[in-house]
Regions:
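Serine/threonine-rich low-complexity intrinsically disordered regions
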Residues: 3-5, 27-30, 47, 62-65, ...
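Periplasmic/extracellular electron-transfer cofactor-ligation site
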Residues: 23-56, 80-89, 105-108
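Post-cleavage N-terminal segment of exported redox proteins
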Residues: 1-24, 73, 77, 102-108
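Extracytoplasmic electron-transfer domains, predominantly the class I c-type cytochrome c fold
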Residues: 53-107
Length: 108
């Protein structure tokens, strides 16, 4: 019986910790507007001017390809860059969790 109580308590603690660690999409939208919108557009669809000027393809952030990425994969791209996308060093910690949460809202 004591083992069952410990298991239930541990499960509750981990589920609250996971919910607390998740980003806030509303706060993430503000981060996105500041750090991502110029290239990725207001709705996650690439800015055509940037695509033409940089001669790049920018994935639709609401696409299945992006949405199937893990949060850690998205964070790695934001903080480390990929291809012609530079690393965004100003987005860290909670802001990084928040922007990932916002990107999840762009799912098509």
């Amino acid at each position: 019986m004591a083992d069952m109580k410990v298991t239930i308590l541990a499960t509750l603690l981990f589920s609250f910790a996971s919910a607390y660690a998740a980003g806030n999409a509303t706060d993430g939208k503000a981060v996105y507007e500041r750090a991502c919108r110029n290239c990725h557009g207001a709705t996650g669809v690439a800015n055509p001017g940037i695509v033409k000027m940089m001669n790049v393809q920018i994935k639709d952030l609401g696409s299945a390809d992006v949405q199937k990425m893990s949060d850690d994969e998205i964070k790695k791209i934001v903080t480390g860059g990929k291809g012609k996308m530079p690393a965004i060093h100003s987005v860290t910690g909670k802001s990084l969790d928040d922007v990932v949460a916002y990107v999840r809202t762009l799912k098509k």
